[in-house]
Amino acid sequence: VLPGNKRPTIKDVAAAAKVSPATVSLALNSKGGVSETTAERVREIARDIGYTPNALARGLQRSSIGMIGLVIRPLDTLESFLPAGVDFFLRLTGAASLAALERGYTLMLVTDPSKPDSPLSALAADAYIVTEPHENDPVLTMLAGERIPFVTIDHDPARPDAFPAFRARATNQVQTMLAHLVEAGAQRVALVTGTDPNAWNIESRDEYLKWCAASGRSPQLLSYPETAGSAVGDDVIDALFGASPTLPLSSPAPDAIFCLTGRHAAGVTEAAIARGIRVPEDLLVAGGSGAIINQTSKPTVTTFDLQPEAVGALAVDAAVKLAERKPLEGPLESPPALIQVRESTTRSQH
């Protein structure tokens, strides 16, 4: 029995039995795939530590409760479930909620259901939508192990073809923004990514490095936690315009900075102006996922509209089909991101 009042989880059983959570799930649900010896040992350990399978989750395979679960993975690493100046998640969740109601379902927003302290209701939905999963994401591993249907918004970069996913097309977004910056006059473009191990960060970095190699440019690549928000501005300007161990001192300062998050872009713009670097005259600044602050800052900042309302509605449609054990037809296509050119990349034509 575990110490204190901690409720034993499938992970605790797996650790005690020295097997994977997926193996525990197979053993406890008598689904085959493991030897009877292993299954009996797992069941015995589960009894010993007091593990009780989630009755709601196990009942999913027999009946429907008319609920879709939404797991927004970036919120699990941000400083708040309501990050200041960010409307992407609100737009996504609102559209998904209404789309679910339209289909006769309700939407339940949950945090990481694979955590030991997650509530019993976290695995109660008929199907799940998981946004921006991480490499080898434990949420996907758990859902797959429990045979609970799910669809992802963007894919697990370590398992790109393992699960149904609406791909975010990070490669296309990077290509589009780099082309825009060059057309606006940029010659040396730096990229600032986040640190979450998701496909958006990884594929954007890879595409940027590929572009640098193909065009004979020296990469100027920095990464900062998404949770830092606009506070990264001074660090980015220090690294790119002052002596820093992050980049060779011989690297010329960039004339454009592309930040994958809108809050990073806002912080960089503010910090540059505070140092006397004019935006956009001396430095072009652009963001990937736009934030409200990018539309109200001075200057306003060029970003993408990732169309979260459309993505949310499409994901709900797919999740409902999975919940009703209907096949998903054809590849899952996300709507293209729309570049919104604003003052930070628009220079006066004189």
Language-model segments: what does each one mean?
Residues 2, 51-117:
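Amphipathic helical "hinge" segments at domain boundaries
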Residues 20, 66, 126, 187-188, ...:
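Short acidic/polar active-site loop segments enriched in Thr and Asp
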Residues 77-79, 83-88, 112-116, 166-176, ...:
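Hinge/beta->alpha junction and helix N-cap segments in small-molecule ligand-binding domains
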Residues 134-175, 263, 289-301:
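Flexible loop/hinge segments that line or gate small-molecule binding clefts
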Residues 187-189, 219-221, 279-284:
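Short acidic capping loops at alpha-helix termini that bridge into adjacent secondary structure
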